[in-house]
């Protein structure tokens, strides 16, 4: 598709679609609780719809009237063997977390996904699950999907140090540990997003978190809850950057989730000199209104323990860095290579094709700015965040057209992205 270029300014306010991580987990915990859980402001992107369908296939009744999602929970012991293979679509969150849920189920399942998901390594989940007594096998020595699995009603507790900083792996092991005989200990490499831990407590469960160590006992039960999903900061990040780099812009984003394990992008924007303000802060819901406006930006260094707090925002942060004076160095981000695409290479290739100066490295990128951008053809390779990054980059293009291939990937996490963009262009 041909993208909008030569933006004269973005102005207006937006309510960001629901957080993808919390939307996935609300369906999972609602299914595993006893009673009817209601979820408002859920994200209806393709990934979350995949999770919803998988739990229906496992025997859970889920109603969606377009406003509220009602989940008739069955508990861990009420899940039923599916009639068919479980389709995870493009969703790494779905296949990894649901592997943990199914670890304690005494039936056969096969989980598969699209071409992109079929290239993502699952060994980081399958290795510890095997240690707990799960039979699971994938393709190649990295256990690529499809995965065949048979869980166990007598899961062994685990003491496990995560070799990578991954909220998905951590969450998969937490779901398995909730079904194990005894106490499990999971030790993170770096602190990652903690929505799973938060929701265990919200649904009446217990766990202990001390620093990077999580202790969790098996045999717990959950009680249905009312969940309101805040806006997704990963989706908001595209508008935060757009408001900073497009001339004559001021954007107000309402009800954005500001869980402290997810706000690295805000820290980086402040560090680069961006004009950003948080207001209407709700400490209970962990949400706020965020306002940004066009800013003069400077390069920075991004690495270490901030990386898990902004891993999904690094593509759009890279675009931000192309519009900052000086050099920006991103390091310790090798996890980008096993996302929907190799995001180090694909981001660098896409923005360099548009005139940026980006050198990919083993674990990140070196970006030299400020560079004007020009038209090019860019392929998302099925990666939603590459698509949205390119659409924001196109707004800065004064010369030529930007042709985005496979733009439909954006529906994975933000189906209303282009209509929201139109609103800001005419705000």
Curated annotation (Swiss-Prot):
This is 3-phosphoshikimate 1-carboxyvinyltransferase. It is found in: Cytoplasm. Keywords: Amino-acid biosynthesis, Aromatic amino acid biosynthesis, Cytoplasm, Transferase. Belongs to the EPSP synthase family. Disulfide bonds: none annotated. Its EC number is 2.5.1.19. Phosphoenolpyruvate binds at residues 20, 92, 120, 168, 343, 385. One of its GO terms (molecular function) is 3-phosphoshikimate 1-carboxyvinyltransferase activity. The active site is at residue 312. Monomer. CDD domains: EPSP_synthase (cd01556). It catalyses: 3-phosphoshikimate + phosphoenolpyruvate = 5-O-(1-carboxyvinyl)-3-phosphoshikimate + phosphate. It comes from Streptococcus thermophilus (strain ATCC BAA-250 / LMG 18311). GO terms for cellular component: cytoplasm. Its main location: cytoplasm. HAMAP family: EPSP_synth. 3-phosphoshikimate binds at residues 20-21, 25, 166, 168, 312, 339. Catalyzes the transfer of the enolpyruvyl moiety of phosphoenolpyruvate (PEP) to the 5-hydroxyl of shikimate-3-phosphate (S3P) to produce enolpyruvyl shikimate-3-phosphate and inorganic phosphate. One of its GO terms (biological process) is chorismate biosynthetic process.
């Amino acid at each position: 598709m041909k993208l909008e270029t030569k933006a004269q300014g973005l102005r207006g306010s937006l309510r960001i679609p629901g957080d993808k991580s919390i939307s996935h987990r609300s369906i999972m915990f609602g299914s595993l609780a006893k009673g009817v859980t209601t979820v408002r402001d859920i994200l209806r992107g393709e990934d979350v719809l995949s999770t919803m369908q998988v739990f229906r296939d496992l025997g859970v009744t889920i109603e969606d009237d377009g406003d509220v999602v009602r989940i008739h929970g069955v508990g861990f012991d009420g899940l039923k063997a599916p009639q068919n293979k479980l389709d995870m679509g493009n969703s790494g969150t779905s296949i990894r977390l649901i592997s943990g849920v199914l670890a304690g189920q005494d039936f056969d399942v096969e989980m598969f996904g699209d071409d992109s998901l079929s290239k993502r390594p699952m060994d980081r989940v399958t290795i510890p699950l095997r240690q707990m007594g799960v039979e699971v096998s994938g393709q190649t020595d990295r256990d690529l999907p499809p995965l065949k699995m048979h869980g166990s009603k007598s899961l062994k507790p685990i003491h496990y140090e995560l070799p990578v900083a991954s909220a998905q792996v951590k969450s998969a092991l937490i779901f398995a540990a909730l079904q194990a005989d005894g106490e499990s200990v999971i030790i993170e490499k770096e602190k990652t997003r903690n929505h799973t831990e938060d929701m265990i407590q919200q649904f009446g469960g217990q766990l202990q978190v001390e620093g990077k160590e999580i202790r969790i006992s098996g045999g717990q039960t959950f009680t249905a809850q009312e969940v309101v999903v805040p806006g997704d900061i990963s989706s908001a990040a595209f508008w935060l950057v757009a408001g900073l780099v497009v001339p004559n812009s001021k954007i107000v984003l309402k009800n954005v989730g500001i869980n402290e394990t997810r706000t690295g992008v805000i820290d980086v924007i402040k560090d680069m000199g961006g004009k950003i303000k948080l207001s209407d802060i709700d400490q209970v819901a962990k949400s706020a209104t965020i306002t940004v406006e066009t800013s003069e930006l400077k390069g920075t260094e991004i690495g270490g323990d901030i990386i898990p707090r902004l891993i999904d925002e690094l593509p759009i942060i890279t675009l931000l860095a192309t519009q900052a004076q000086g050099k920006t160095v991103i390091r310790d981000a090798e996890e980008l290579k096993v996302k929907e695409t190799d995001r180090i290479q694909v981001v660098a290739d896409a923005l360099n094709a548009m005139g940026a100066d980006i050198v990919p490295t083993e674990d990140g990128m070196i970006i030299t700015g400020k560079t004007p951008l020009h038209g090019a053809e860019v392929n998302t390779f099925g990666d939603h965040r590459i698509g949205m990054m390119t659409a924001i980059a196109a707004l800065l293009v004064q010369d030529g057209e930007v042709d985005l291939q496979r733009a439909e990937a954006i529906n994975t996490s933000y189906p209303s992205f282009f209509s929201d963009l139109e609103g800001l262009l005419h705000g």
